[in-house]
Amino acid sequence: MVSGILLALDDQFFSVDNLKGDGITTDGQLICEAIQRRLKSSNVGPDAKRDKLMSEFAIIRTSARLNEKDEKLGKTPLKFYTEFLKERVFDSIKYKSSAEDFIGRFYGEFMSYSGGDGQSLGIILTPAHICELFCDLLDVQPTDIVLDPCCGTAGFLVAAMHRMDYAAGDDQTVRKNIRKKQLHGFELQSNMFAIACTNMILREDGNSNIQCQDFLKQNPALVQQKGATIGMMNPPYSQGTKADPSQYELSFVEHLLDSLVKGAKAAVIVPQSSMTGKTKDEQHFKESIMMHHTLEGVITCNTDTFYGVGTNPVIAVFTAHEPHPTDKICKFIDFRNDGYEVRAHIGLVEGDSAKDKKQHLLDVWFGRTEAPSKFCVESTAQADDEWLHSFYYFNDEIPTEADFEKAIGDYLSFEFSMIMQNREYLFTGGAANDEA
């Protein structure tokens, strides 16, 4: 409903003042007519795509409760929502240069109250600062073609478009080409698809090259014809099983890499467990990925990145269609302390040090500065390794006096505990049977 109202507000012939709660032409009908006009003016097609979008907005027209005047409000709930969204949200999207996924934030907030936040489907929306970090890590340029095969509410595509626009400056030809030809996505869930299309259309991406299809069923060779040089993805989490290994996160990763052009860069955010190869199928995916593509590095993220979900994520970066050299040096970074912190009743917020810590990460990633091994380990990698900083890291720092005292204290506490349990043989060289 929110995305539909925002589309209606973007129609030049639509006015909130025309919403009068009329029993003949309801507010919902007026809004849906405006949505239809806005989709046509943006050349959204084919007709099947436009019809699918309109079906997602049907509740605006069909809900009697939304279209009846409320005595307390003195207007229909639809008019109240429309006025609120115009004042608080629409102008921010339309007239400010922002990479913020406002509609995605609405979706996430509503779902958190519904008792069904999409986790049963593995849906975890990507925070805005992660979308922006992807653009930094992949060094997105105005000439790039971006593909997000699990685009959700289009957060990655919005961030990429914002970055490309900024780099393009006032060149309107380049900016128009970015919107028409250089942003592509797939989304399986029809409600998410509608939100994603709305997000792009409101930012003047008229044709919105997002398809409501299952990415895993697409032929990589055909997707490759889009010419994508950048891949960004937050795939569904924890859906893979022994019975259906195609749903593992690494399956999505391999399919994405196969769908990009040679030399393209891709970044994905997945659970840490995906990097360990904990099942035979996942190990097979890791081997196949290295056989055909190159792992550039893995960044361990803040454990609260997806606050309230309980997933410990990592960002993995790859180069497509270049087999991983055995002597390739990868970077494994511990970025858990990213400057973002959880505040009561608010959630994850940017701390005072976040910008500086992000800049340090990028300086290390691009080789502009060195970092101690506790932050970044540079190492070769194999398919049977755990692609995590914690796997490659060896604490080679000289212990401090406080570290030494703590270690001795821990040992003495352990020894005392064992003696009190009549297990002093552990420290005398005797056997457990001697006690008997």
Question: What is each stretch, according to the model?
Answer:
Residues 224-225, 230-436:
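A conserved structural/catalytic subdomain of Rossmann-like adenosyl-cofactor enzymes
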Residues 120-230, 238-240, 246, 250, ...:
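Conserved S-adenosyl-L-methionine
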Residues 52, 212, 300-303:
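A generic structural motif
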Residues 3-114:
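Long recognition/docking surfaces used for binding and targeting
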Residues 1-4, 100-104, 108, 128, ...:
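Non-catalytic, well-ordered alpha-helical scaffold segments
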